[in-house]
Amino acid sequence: MSEKFNPDNLEKLNNPERLNLIDLRELLKILDLKDDPKIADVGAGTGLFSRAFLEKLPNCTLYALDISDEFLNYMDINLQEYYGDRLKIGKMQETHIPLKDNSIDLIVMINLHHELLSPKELLKDAYRVLKEEGKIFIADWKEGMHKGALSKDSIISDMKEAAFSPIEEVLLSNELICLIGER
């Protein structure tokens, strides 16, 4: 990730106010997931959004994945005991998700896309791990909201190149572009 988040700023990343960036309740309505979904939070950071999904979906299994050992340790200390077997914490590489092919119902990537050196490669790997008709949710800064923000068209182009179709923009945030793609 080109501008990897500095773990010294962990409290900023873990600020509960960030949960207000996205209307998660509406997102879950739109996604219409089955009763016991398998979810991968790619670039999970401190697990703030992982925790929110685990709370809202009590029967889900969630894989919280990150490249940073500091963030993985933070999640292990602060989340693992509370969520037990429902939470799987794992180290990933920037372009590789360490999960089996066709194993995940939903991948979420929140404020990650603009930090990636090779977003198309990661999206191709996300496609690989998604089940047939699985979905990816990408939320990232709208242009002008963050110094590294990408255009919506650029993100959609990356998703198309990874074979996601259809791709739908959903209005869940004033600050973030929110896109759902299907395998």
Task: Give residue spans per PLM region.
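Core SAM-dependent methyltransferase catalytic element
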Residues: 172-183
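Conserved beta-strand signature within the Rossmann-like core of class I S-adenosyl-L-methionine
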Residues: 133-141
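A short SAM/SAH-binding and catalytic strip from SAM-dependent methyltransferases
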Residues: 105-118
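Short alpha-helix
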Residues: 148-162, 177
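Conserved SAM-binding loop and adjacent beta-strand
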Residues: 9-26, 147-148
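A short glycine-rich, Lys/Arg-flanked "PGG" loop and its adjoining helix->strand segment in the class I
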Residues: 120-132
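Class I SAM-dependent methyltransferase SAM/SAH-binding core
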Residues: 40, 46-96
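A short acidic, Gly/Pro-enriched loop at the edge of an enzyme's catalytic core
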Residues: 95-107
